[in-house]
Amino acid sequence: QATYGCAPNKVWLYMTNPTLNSWNPTVASAEVDLEGMHIVEKNKDGTTTDIHFDKLDKPRRISCTFTRGKIRGAFTAILLGSADSTSLECTLDVEGLGLFTKPQKKLEEYLETLRKVLGD
């Protein structure tokens, strides 16, 4: 869980726009389809992340599946809060990871990067 000092709309905006204000330093560019239900992130390390949104209930729920190389997974975020504070609860299920990869740590790093952009 993470908490941000801003409205859910702002958190939603950044989570669905990986290149907005260069907030995610690992993403070099992204292609977003017209409906916003499919994103292909081109990462600075040369890999791509293919994201398909299953559910976008703005601004309260995001649900997607993703593929990055041999790694596949599902991500769900539920945003709770009001105009000046948002609590974000996430679940992350990952397949295809090596023994030493820690998905929870990666998720925490992602949420911390988002916190730096949005404020505490």
How would you label these PLM feature ranges?
Residues 1-31:
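Hydrophobic ligand-binding cavity/cleft-lining segments
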Residues 1-5, 52, 78:
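Generic structural detector for well-ordered beta-strands
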Residues 9, 60, 86:
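Glycine-centered loop/turn positions within well-structured domains
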Residues 13-20, 58, 108-112, 116-119:
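Short, intrinsically disordered, mixed-charge
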Residues 19-70, 74:
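Glycine-rich portal/gate segments that line the openings of hydrophobic small-molecule binding cavities
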Residues 63-120:
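Beta-strand/loop substructures that line and gate deep hydrophobic ligand-binding cavities in soluble
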